[in-house]
Design a protein with these regions (language model features):
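Short aromatic-glycine-(Arg/Gly/Cys) micro-motifs in beta-strand/loop hairpins
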Residues: 1-28
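A short, charged, amphipathic alpha-helix used as a generic interaction element across diverse proteins
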Residues: 22-59
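N-terminal non-cleavable signal-anchor helices
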Residues: 17-20, 55, 94
């Protein structure tokens, strides 16, 4: 999904950060109203070493889209703008 589509999707979507808590298959989810908030939580969880993904959920259309790549790009962009190093977990992803 590109940024134009993501921006259009933001009008009706909520964002779910899925957190995989290990091999037991038990995880959790955290729903956010904004993509930026979801990216903050995703970044934090990845820093803690919890494998996570970000999904846009459009309750109006009943659709979902994996937007983890867009979350990674936003976090990299933030690091670049702030002139800080990428998180270690993100270096291996990009």
């Amino acid at each position: 999904m590109n940024y134009d589509k993501l921006n259009a999707y933001k009008l009706t979507a909520r964002y779910l950060v899925l957190i995989d808590c290990g091999s037991d298959g038990i995880g959790s989810g955290d729903i956010h109203a904004s993509f930026d908030d979801a990216c903050d939580v995703y970044d934090c969880q990845m820093d803690f070493g919890d494998a996570s993904t970000v999904h846009a959920i459009d309750f109006t259309d009943g659709t979902t889209q994996d937007v983890t790549a867009e979350a990674n790009a936003l976090i990299a962009k933030r690091c670049n703008e702030r002139a800080v190093d990428l998180p270690t977990w993100l270096e291996g992803v990009l």
